Amino acid sequence: MKIAIIGSGIAGLTSAYLLARRHEITLFEASDWIGGHTHTVDVQLDGRDYAIDTGFIVFNDWTYPNFIRLLERLGVASRPTEMSFSVHDPDSGCEYNGNNLNSLFAQRRNLLSPSFLGMLRDILRFNREALRDLAEERIGGDITLGDYLARGRYGRRFVDHYIVPMGAAIWSMSLADMLDFPLQFFVRFFKNHGLLSVNDRPQWRVIAGGSRAYVAPLTASFRERIRLNCPVWLVERDADGVTLLSPAGRERFDKVVFACHSDQALTLWQANTKIGRAHV
């Protein structure tokens, strides 16, 4: 079959890698590079070279089993790393790192700080109650993180110096926007990544040489089928297949894989026919 793949992030590249074995694929990428969130920068410091990842950085053995198998098949090496969370607030002077007790109480005055100790109690309470509420289906789809924190009367130190900045760091959002984040997705993500547990946590890993190291071997078998700077403008579906409109013109394909964000896919999709609406 002739298959169009829209997007060259990990979803698009893996789809192309697997489908290219038996089908004629064409991968469309609107930007001038492939890899999606994969972005590695070379930095020299004190005579040493470092590959710094600024997009996709880490993965773990709990939630990335297929990605780990893919790296093994490609012969791409990875190594274990540590994940920790640090806060420095110049306004309040609060500073800590959650890696161990010594770094948690790096400011020794926090050993006797009611607000800091209250934050630690709130962390344990949130971990316990959020998991329970998720399991008992007491978190509605319309409840936000801010709603839940207000309803649970969590302290300002916990809100401002732990849960909100941690979420903002993970999803690259402002602190204000983080409060409007859907709670159900938030808790499920934290649970799946071991962030609601003090002891039982996954092993985090990084790709040796930076995350870019997997892109070349992954695309080696179909690199000539990749079109850079070639955004898809429109996708039309009919009973016999799909038509794509791009800078290359109108082209027919048997199937299309939307490996882009959902809002982008909906923009491209022509849902003005019965068959289109049924598939949307």
Explain the meaning of each model-derived region.
Residues 41-67:
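N-terminal glycine-rich dinucleotide-binding loop that anchors FAD/FMN and/or NAD(P) in oxidoreductases
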Residues 275-280:
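Conserved small/polar residues in nucleotide/adenosyl-binding loops
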Residues 188-246:
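Helical element adjacent to the flavin cofactor pocket in flavoenzyme catalytic cores
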Residues 61-183, 187-188:
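Mobile amphipathic helical/loop "lid" adjacent to a hydrophobic cofactor/ligand pocket
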